[in-house]
Amino acid sequence: MIRQAIARVVEGQNLKESDMIEVMNQIMGGEATPAQIGALIVALRMKGETVEEITGAARVMRDHATPVRVGRVLDIDREEINLDQETMAAVLDTCGTGGSGTKSFNISTTVAFVVAACGVKVAKHGNRSVSSMCGSADVLEALGVHLDIGVDTVERCIAEEGIGFLFAPALHGAMRYAIGPRREIGIRTIFNILGPLTNPAGADRQVLGVYREDLVATLADVLCRLGCRRGFVVHGMDGMDEVTLTAPTRIADIREGRYSLSTIAPEDYGLQRCRLEDLAGGDARHNAELVRGILAGEAGPRRDIVLLNSAFALVAAGKADSIEDGMRAAAQAIDEHAALAKLNALIRMTQP
């Protein structure tokens, strides 16, 4: 099937979701050669990936991922009750596509601790750096979080502390067949888009940052098809894959299978604009210091952008009714050192 798919995409034809599912199953099953994988993803990039193609690929990656179970089970002799199903507890992810090129610090990773401190279960999906100086896995490792842990430990972190890190290479083993072609090609492809769509914990609430404005509506449509209950897809007009403070942000607001588009500005929430340099990061050690400083209460643009993005996450998780309420809750979580406590708890629970 993959040879026929390559031929069709090269001719500018779109693949149906069912076709993409068949092709991705070949790739994930080790039945496609590196040359075929490389040809397909480059052809898709040149044509432009469609909603159906991305959705089909995401479904297969989800099916092949090692599942992380976030439900806590209560045994009351007569039966077991999944507490998360019964209470409809939200599970949130703050994973973005990366690739913005803005060299900012790890905003969404910092947000994860703030949101967890506000009572949201966070299944933070991430990886090492691909296009930036420091990915989420890099900064967490520099902070003291161990990445080489079993799924049972990740599940326990989420159950007991409300936050766990889902290290993509450990949970997407079938992706090993695409690693070589991706590395050798060296350009953004559909796989850069798929990471945030394939959380192994099945997070149904999400704030997803994207590196291109046209991906806002595309990935909002994909998330709706994949069952996202509430979420936002965001793109800063300065290039950031976050809600930004230096420019307006394009946003897709997802609610129960539908989405609406809007543009917001920092001033809408009483925040001052800043420069990209004010949000800059560095290597893993430097970014770890920045994260600790923010969670310890340091003021400035970095704190402000964390508060703003945390607010969107809290609205997505159903913990805040408005962005303003979310910002107040996030500020309280930081100022009372609850967010810092979540970081320290994750470090402690992941020690060998």
Swiss-Prot record:
GO terms for molecular function: anthranilate phosphoribosyltransferase activity; magnesium ion binding. Binds 2 magnesium ions per monomer. Anthranilate 1 binds at G96, N127. It is an enzyme of class 2 (transferase). Its EC number is 2.4.2.18. 5-phospho-alpha-D-ribose 1-diphosphate binds at residues 96, 99-100, 104, 106-109, 124-132, 136. It holds the Pfam family Glycos_trans_3N. Mg(2+) 1 binds at S108, E242. Keywords: Amino-acid biosynthesis, Aromatic amino acid biosynthesis, Glycosyltransferase, Magnesium, Metal-binding, Transferase, Tryptophan biosynthesis. It catalyses: N-(5-phospho-beta-D-ribosyl)anthranilate + diphosphate = 5-phospho-alpha-D-ribose 1-diphosphate + anthranilate. Pathway: Amino-acid biosynthesis; L-tryptophan biosynthesis; L-tryptophan from chorismate: step 2/5. InterPro entries: Anthranilate_Pribosyl_Tfrase (IPR005940), Glycosyl_Trfase_fam3 (IPR000312), Glycosyl_Trfase_fam3_N_dom (IPR017459), Glycosyl_Trfase_fam3_N_dom_sf (IPR036320), Nuc_phospho_transferase (IPR035902). Anthranilate 2 binds at R182. One of its GO terms (cellular component) is cytosol. One of its GO terms (biological process) is L-tryptophan biosynthetic process. Homodimer. Belongs to the anthranilate phosphoribosyltransferase family. PANTHER family: ANTHRANILATE PHOSPHORIBOSYLTRANSFERASE. This is Anthranilate phosphoribosyltransferase. The gene is trpD.
